[in-house]
Amino acid sequence: MCADDVPQVFDLERESFNDSSWTIDAFYHEILKNSFAHYFVMEYDQRIIGYIGIWIVIDQAQITTVAIQHDYRGYGLGQLLLKYAMHYTQTKCDTMSLEVRVDNHVAQHVYENLGFQYGGKRKNYYGEGEDAMVMWVKLND
């Protein structure tokens, strides 16, 4: 992902996450100033239809955000992005973790199919009393 991608990624972020979306400045900071951050986009017909963000800190990978444009959901593209992130980080990291809304059962199912397991709950993670489930996977067996 490069700085030119940020406006499209930001639009997709708002479409996907509404009130809890990141600001456009947060995305610019991530790709231009955060040395832990690695971001990738998925394109179709010269449009960004998905993206994923990862922080790599020592031997731990953290999925910071992942989204697929609404019209392209249900085709396995989110799983493809996650597999790419897992492959990208497996030589550098032992484990990968993420947070997901406790009521987002579709995403939880995708993560479980990739080997992620329940790791705990973060109370009020998304604000407004909305909790997050922490999930993690071991990258190297």
Predicted regions and their residues:
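Conserved glycine-rich acetyl-CoA-binding loop
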Residues: 47, 65, 69-83, 95, ...
